[in-house]
Amino acid sequence: MGKKSKAQSDNVSQPGKTDVTLPFLGGKAAIDPTVASLFEKSAGPVKAPSVQPIITQRKENGPEDDVEKEEDDEEISELEEDLQSEDEDMQDVSEVAGDAERTLAVDTQAPSSKKRKRAPAEDLEETYMRRIAKEEQKEQEKRRAEKAKRQKVEEGGKDSDPVSDKSKDGRDESSEEEDEITVPRHETQSGDPESKELEKSNRTVFLGNVSSQAIKSKSAKKTLLKHLASFLSTLPESTGPHKVESIRFRSVAFASGGKVPKRAAFARREILDDTTPSTNAYVVYSTVQAARKAPAALNGTVVLDRHLRVDSVAHPSQIDHKRCVFVGNLDFVDNETDPEEDDKKKKKKKSGPADVEEGLWRTFNAHTKGSKERASTRGNVESVRVVRDRTTRVGKGFAYVQFYDQVCVEEALLLDGKKFPPMLPRKLRVTRAKKLPKKRDGPETGSHGKALGEGFSTLQGRAGKLFGRAGAAKMKAEGRKSISGNSVVFEGNRASEGSSRIKIKTKSRGSKGKPKNRSAKRAAAYQAAGGRKGKMAK
């Protein structure tokens, strides 16, 4: 084969010979010399086309670039080729950044490295937020240090000059202004005012039987606040800084009798102590954990010579009539005198004024034993509810006392017909509390006709207290929307006694009277005669 191919190449190279034959063909076929001449010379391997880069002229932005170009003409001429390749990659970046900074950066780079390796850029937003967080932390630490210094100065230097007092007052005002500065929040975190109030109710605690001295005296108020924060040290620090944010007094009887606005009467301290020396209050804690633990830690404790009633607003304690006692024949007003004294008209030594609420706390705690652990610490009384008028705070003459233990009810019934002066000068009427069913038109129903549960009713109660009647009615209307409106989702209720009974309507036999027509009489006579047997016997 090699020899034949050599001969073939020799025959093709000779231009004079026209009739060339190939041995591997079947016959003697002639080859066209014009076609054969095309394959005489080879062009060789194909070379890749060389693309020449387009030279782009840089725009002049300012006089500083002109000065640098005049000084560094030689260096820029050597690096023009490198800059052309880098301009294609960094064209977008060069439009944003200044040309002066780019030229200085190029001069420092080595001319051999055409493509530089870029380091991963840091996230500017993360670094900015980190810096802001550090600054806020430093500011908070400074404020805490300043507060601690101020407290030490106030405690140590009470007998100071008036000039120094003025300077301290100025510092206090400036520090209070700094404390009032709040960190801005996003609108998704701020929320609506209604949702804020509901969230605030989870951190709110109700106080009953609070001494009215806390309104009149600043020292008494400080004592009360210190007592309310006494258990916060036992809470874990990880849940947040626990403290008492605010306290507001409610159900206060004013001496003006409604002629003066309540705020003005409160500012003047015109409080009517003749009706009752106690009042109610609401305390707001900074965390939900503190508000949850406050009832268990503070209920039944003594502060300002009165037993404190503590209960949660969001999750109030259950009223159990089996552990309750009804107490009647109480004084309407606390300064009421003994009726037997007016009849006898005898001069006696003046005794202390009556105090219905505190007297019930002390009397039933002293005369009930219950469990030894409970009696040794705080007593067996869980709560005392004296029914009073809203505006005048005059009592209705009866109250309810609830115990922790059901055994204490039997011991409390033994106090019927007894009196305990001076706080309870009248004879008490003690009976068991009865559970009276509330008469309602019907249960609240949703859009699908299902009865709403206890959770919805408790929410309605809180809405009525926080937002008033109009706000509660608005929330009630929103709650009746369909589930697609993101209102209330019903997931079922727990089984209770008697709920498993299925009510089926059955036909009552004998409810309708028997017919008294002719056919009924004939049937009765037929049955009386013994039926078919009686007929055949005849």
From Swiss-Prot:
Residues 63-92 have a biased composition (Acidic residues). Residues 1-25, 41-203, 336-378, 433-455, 476-538 are annotated as: Disordered. Residues 203-315, 323-435 form the RRM domain. The keyword Repeat applies. Keywords: Coiled coil, Nucleus, Repeat, Ribosome biogenesis, RNA-binding, rRNA processing. GO terms for molecular function: RNA binding. Residues 64-156 form a coiled coil. GO terms for cellular component: nucleolus. It comes from the Eukaryota. One of its GO terms (biological process) is maturation of LSU-rRNA from tricistronic rRNA transcript (SSU-rRNA, 5.8S rRNA, LSU-rRNA). Residues 502-521 have a biased composition (Basic residues). Residues 127-144, 151-173, 182-202 have a biased composition (Basic and acidic residues). It is found in: Nucleus, Nucleolus. PANTHER family: EUKARYOTIC TRANSLATION INITIATION FACTOR 4B/4H, RNA-BINDING PROTEIN 34. Involved in pre-25S rRNA processing. This is Nucleolar protein 12. It comes from Aspergillus fumigatus (strain ATCC MYA-4609 / CBS 101355 / FGSC A1100 / Af293).
